[in-house]
Amino acid sequence: DSGSTVVALTNDRDTSYFGEIGIGTPPQKFTVIFDTGSSYLWVPSSKAHSMYESSDSSTYKEQDFIEATEEADNVFLNRLFDGILGLSFQTISVPVWYNMVNQGLVKRFSFWLNRNVDEEEGGELVFGGLDPNHFRGDHTYVPVTYQYYWQFGIGDVLIGDKSTGFCAPGCQAFADSGTSLLSGPTAIVTQINHAIGANSEELNVKFGLTPEQYILKGEATQCISGFTAMDATLLGPLWILGDVFMRPYHTVFDYGNLLVGFAEAA
């Protein structure tokens, strides 16, 4: 689309996708995961990869922030990226990309994640539009049901052509570019990992996953299931549609109309 900004993404073994951003003037460069499952911008200290020095920026403004000097988990240890840039809603925390919205620059953004780790182009994030080279047909759009994550309702979940019955009354899900796997209720994921075959149904449109799409390569001859169990939340049964789901489906996050759209990736 005219006026869109394209960010090239790097695919790290199908486990994470990250691209480059610049902070300040002149820009100090970082590689970050663009995460639709959070709203925070994490920039690590000099003890990690890159360091943001506010005094080197002519556009830096005093603002409230939280500095973590010690982290129990090894979040960024041995990672190829420096930090995380959240693309979710301000209910969690006011995200950086809201500045683009408030300036009238961006009403939507879209992801294409390349499954082929051998190709130079690992993926693509487009702020402000879509890249027609990376999807086929029309997108199926669903309304955002809760402005915390990019959350929407889904119908029944099938294993093969058989209903699991668990989500027949309806479940909630959100598309999360910062999560590697596809997480769902333990009862269903246990069945899926036993049968190793799954589909999700929404608005009478089926979005299927083939074994090539949900099985990850491990060491040597090892294969890893792309499904992981997660018990019910306060919002009820919840699915996190991570990169396993977003790779085969070009995904649009439409803030202007509060919609999430999926089309076959190309």
Swiss-Prot record:
| Entry PTM | N-glycosylated.
Question: What residues make up the catalytic site?
Answer: D35, D176
Where found in the cell? Microsome membrane; Protein storage vacuole; Secreted, Cell wall; Secreted, Extracellular space, Extracellular matrix
Write the Enzyme Commission number(s) for this entry. Answer: 3.4.23.-
- What is the recorded name of this protein? Cardosin-G
Kindly indicate whether the keyword Glycoprotein belongs to this entry.
yes
What family does the database annotate? Answer: Belongs to the peptidase A1 family.
Q: List the disulfide bonds.
A: C167-C171
List the top taxonomic levels of the source: Eukaryota, Viridiplantae, Streptophyta, Embryophyta, Tracheophyta
Q: Which Pfam families match?
A: Asp
InterPro entries from the entry?
Aspartic_peptidase_A1, Aspartic_peptidase_AS, PEPTIDASE_A1, Peptidase_aspartic_dom_sf
Q: Where do transmembrane segments lie in this chain?
A: none
